[in-house]
UniProtKB/Swiss-Prot annotation:
UniProt GO molecular function: acetylpyruvate hydrolase activity; acylpyruvate hydrolase activity; fumarylpyruvate hydrolase activity; metal ion binding; oxaloacetate decarboxylase activity; oxaloacetate tautomerase activity
Phosphoserine PTM positions: 37
Name of the gene encoding the protein in the UniProt record: FAHD1
Subcellular location field: Mitochondrion; Cytoplasm, Cytosol
UniProt KW keywords: Acetylation, Cytoplasm, Hydrolase, Isomerase, Lyase, Magnesium, Manganese, Metal-binding, Mitochondrion, Phosphoprotein, Transit peptide
PANTHER family, per the entry: ACYLPYRUVASE, ACYLPYRUVASE FAHD1, MITOCHONDRIAL
Protein's name in the database: Oxaloacetate tautomerase FAHD1, mitochondrial
Subunit comment: Homodimer.
Organism: Homo sapiens (Human)
Length: 221
């Protein structure tokens, strides 16, 4: 079974996409939100995955689709209620991810006190890079992330600026959701989120490790 489910292709069989909101203070400020004492969590379905080579699909119901650049932590084995001190033992690797967000829809959901599902969980709302093995990143809190739209730099941030550390997040999430091998946790976005439109090209990367490119398209249905 392990041979038929390589962790390097987690997006083909991983079950859970767990996302953390408001984890960079500069992004919290740009969104005019409050810094909370615990992580904000939401989920995406596995059909949200868009590996490089496939398009980002812009839902017909949004006029304001935003990019959010995030480090994804890929779980290497099952974990439930793990202590923070042991949390990194359960990590299998990493990937660069985008949390594509229908911002206008999210704003309406916030006003009405509704979940963010329509804004965050649509098909192809989670573009992902190639898998980066854990061994290539000794300290995930010392990474530089960047994103460009049509060649223009939009986002640039350092994972050292996270409010909640990766071990804390894993421990916190695992006390609520049993995490399985192949699951991924998106750890939040730095400042600079902004709109994209049909035919835009998004390039993003982790300095010195991995990069990815996606085109924005409208679905045919």
């Amino acid at each position: 079974m392990a041979a038929s489910r390589p962790l390097s292709r987690f997006w083909e069989w991983g079950k859970n996409i767990v996302c953390v909101g408001r984890n960079y203070a500069d992004h919290v400020r740009e969104m005019r939100s409050a810094v909370l004492s615990e992580p904000v969590l939401f989920l995406k379905p596995s059909t949200a995955y868009a590996p490089e080579g496939s398009p980002i699909l812009m839902p017909a119901y949004t006029r304001n689709l935003h990019h959010e650049l995030e480090l994804g932590v890929v779980m290497g084995k099952r974990c439930r209620a793990v202590p923070e001190a042991a949390a990194m033992d359960y990590v299998g690797g990493y990937a660069l991810c985008l949390d594509m967000t229908a911002r206008d829809v999210q704003d309406e959901c916030k006003k009405k006190g509704l979940p963010w599902t329509l804004a965050k969980s649509f098909t192809a709302s989670c573009p992902v890079s190639a898998f980066v093995p854990k061994e290539k990143i000794p300290d995930p809190h010392k990474l530089k992330l960047w994103l460009k739209v049509n060649g223009e730099l939009r986002q640039e941030g350092e994972t050292s600026s996270m409010i909640f550390s990766i071990p804390y997040i894993i421990s916190y999430v695992s006390k609520i959701i049993t995490l399985e091998e192949g699951d991924i946790i998106l750890t939040g976005t730095p400042k600079g989120v902004g709109p994209v439109k049909e035919n835009d090209e998004i390039e993003a990367g982790i300095h010195g490790l991995v990069s990815m490119t996606f085109k924005v398209e409208k679905p045919e249905y």
